[in-house]
From Swiss-Prot:
The chain crosses the membrane at residues 4-24. It is found in: Plastid, Chloroplast thylakoid membrane. SUPFAM superfamilies: PetL subunit of the cytochrome b6f complex (SSF103436). Belongs to the PetL family. InterPro entries: Cyt_b6/f_cplx_su6. This is Cytochrome b6-f complex subunit 6. It comes from the Eukaryota. HAMAP family: Cytb6_f_PetL (MF_00433). Keywords: Chloroplast, Electron transport, Membrane, Photosynthesis, Plastid, Thylakoid, Transmembrane, Transmembrane helix, Transport. It comes from Sorghum bicolor. GO terms for cellular component: chloroplast thylakoid membrane; cytochrome b6f complex.
Length: 31
């Protein structure tokens, strides 16, 4: 159970961090 919950937590974190990184890169490119 712990491995499944930690996996979903990691997946959720990746889904939230990845778009943030793309937005940051786009802002840097615009500047």
């Amino acid at each position: 159970m712990l491995t499944i919950t930690s996996y979903f937590g990691f997946l959720l974190a990746a889904l939230t961090i990845t778009p943030a990184l793309f937005i940051g890169l786009n802002k840097i490119r615009l500047i």
